[in-house]
Amino acid sequence: MLRTLLIILLLPLAFCHPVNADHKGHTVESMVQWIVDNSRYEYHGDPYPNIVLESPQQVCETIYPNAEPHADCNIAGYYDHEQNRIAIADVVTEYMVEDHFTEVVLIHELVHFVQYHDGEYERAKCMPELEIDAFGLQDQWIDEQGIDPEQKNDPLFVVFVTMCQDGHGPIGNTH
């Protein structure tokens, strides 16, 4: 009797783990496998990141901790490799659309998760360089999944945000 009660009470908790989180039918595990299948990166069995939703203000405060809050901060998410955590804005940001918003941000941040654990952070010349593959794989995911093409990245924006300032730079949280 006690065993049955425990199973009934604990079974729903099994589906709270990020690997089982519903991202339009995709699991974190299947998304990481897709990244590996479509890139030069390898997954080494590292624990999957914790995934949380935050207000856009919280996201921006984390990325820019010493800056004054400002309304034009439009960061949709970030991967914190020190805490193995992905935060995604809980509302659609200005330059994205609603169609599969959370899923699209998640695939981008999972690219950074895989990059970090595959050693790409050490190989990259600068942090912005890490965004090249993240944006490219994000756009490929959008195409393959039939997501609204308005969700794709503006090519000029990608060029601008992936340029290294001086070829060097600290590798911190990526977004």
Model-identified regions with their sequence ranges:
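Bacterial N-terminal signal peptides
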Residues: 5-14
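Active-site scaffold of zinc-dependent metalloenzymes
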Residues: 65-99
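Substrate-binding clefts and substrate-entry loops adjacent to catalytic sites
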Residues: 89-96, 114-125
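Active-site recognition of the HExxH zinc-binding catalytic motif
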Residues: 104-117
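Soluble non-cytosolic domains of exported or imported proteins
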Residues: 22-26, 96-105, 124-132
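Post-HExxH zinc-binding segment in Zn-dependent metallohydrolases
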Residues: 125-159
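A metal-dependent hydrolase signature that marks the N-terminal structural subdomain at the beginning
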Residues: 15-72
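Short, low-complexity, Pro/Ser/Thr/Gly-rich segments in the mature regions of secreted, periplasmic
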Residues: 157-175
